[in-house]
């Protein structure tokens, strides 16, 4: 009998261990609620960590928000990155293009009217390892942009295993600031592996071309009144610019005419401008006021100079650090540190690489895909002067700069001039008025129109409603039939298109629910194994009595189950009624504390947190 119980315990333990070690499925990532929001009924979201490097415990955190409306023939998926390096893409999710804004110190959540998930799936990724909710062994942080490309290719491979319905989407990479380095490197890698069908890139206020961008700091600062144009200021800044030029020439000589991402001597230009802005704005012996280098229309206390901006950033930080959010977004227990906007240690390790600047990758990428550069005109740190100069000097698709005669045209949204725009040979550029380093933070709805124009949504809306692209024709009342889960009437004039849409929707739904059912099916098998073993042991214990009644092994198993039920006072019942798999797939576990903020690397730049660091 002891042997039988040992066998039972061993087999049961083996079955349960196999269940525990089963790879994660979609159901493990399903987001059932958002702290501070009354309901998520209008959202379909998944989030959590994906293991991409088992050797170093490398896990990347993602937050996928599915499109509210399907309006294009093929679904669109936007992958968003923030910069730094080492700054979390939760900035993008909660300050810019995501579905929510944290609006007050009570951590109340409001919808974002300019959210990019209206007509496209949006996938926010904290990368590289150590950024935001992502993590790895601390001695395994990445040291180069080529490694970032490999990391993201591995992530996308694992992501598509979890979400196979996304495998045939049109993919776009988007981001801002130092993502101007990330995105071209990631795009180049994904083109080589063809892991996804990459259609285009969107880079906002990007850091891509050191030479042309460093040289435009002084002209921008003087033209926009960041500092007064005095003889002394011009003299001081010319000295800094001359030092930068010498450093650039030396760097080119060492690297066959190419420049790295950062040149330390050139960073002093920016530091000098901010220092001068402090001197002009501050009373003698005062703490000091300086320009906000992310939005020159604002000021900040020295030495923050922009790091206290945006104004709602403290609410976002508190919301992301609270246990309720950590649990709701399915962050792994292995993530020990609290969320922080930017990890200085990640940035410090990334700066150890000696990668060529991403500008050298742009011509090849422009041969095969469209690229949109957009800039807010109030940003100093990655200002529009620098990016416009980059385009003028860039050679792509057979020519240098814009085709002769092309100039920036007025960009009108809903009858209002929102900036300047031009497109030529797969390259589109938009300068947005009254916008900062984080353009969608200031102009969310205009940026949504910009996105829709670029990825083909505006044309689809125009075909549907008869309005012109860019005229704000996104009227939800016109789109009831395209909304996720809805079905058109049989007499609709576009029934053929609807059939295709319903077919795509069915494929996606089948794939998602297949993943959900796998978890329940595995659990059922484990339960049946345990019940079978219990019945077998009961039969062994009572086999003398069973043989007298000529009862079979199968009969004794069911007899044992029946007696077990009766001993509890009656048959077992399903008190919950019909099981709602979407609501009960993930029961909340114990809250856990992510711990204290990781100490920032001592070598990390104090002045700059979302820009290229040196």
Curated annotation (Swiss-Prot):
Membrane topology of the entry: Single-pass type I membrane protein
Signal peptide (from-to): 1-17
Disulfide bridge positions per record: none
Swiss-Prot/TrEMBL keywords: Apoptosis, Carboxypeptidase, Glycoprotein, Golgi apparatus, Hydrolase, Membrane, Protease, Signal, Transmembrane, Transmembrane helix
Stretch list, region Disordered: 465-503
Primary location class: Golgi
EC class of the enzyme, as a word: hydrolase
Glycan-modified residues: 42, 426, 434
Family as reported in the entry's similarity comment: Belongs to the peptidase S10 family.
UniProt protein name: Pheromone-processing carboxypeptidase KEX1
Organism: Yarrowia lipolytica (strain CLIB 122 / E 150) (Yeast)
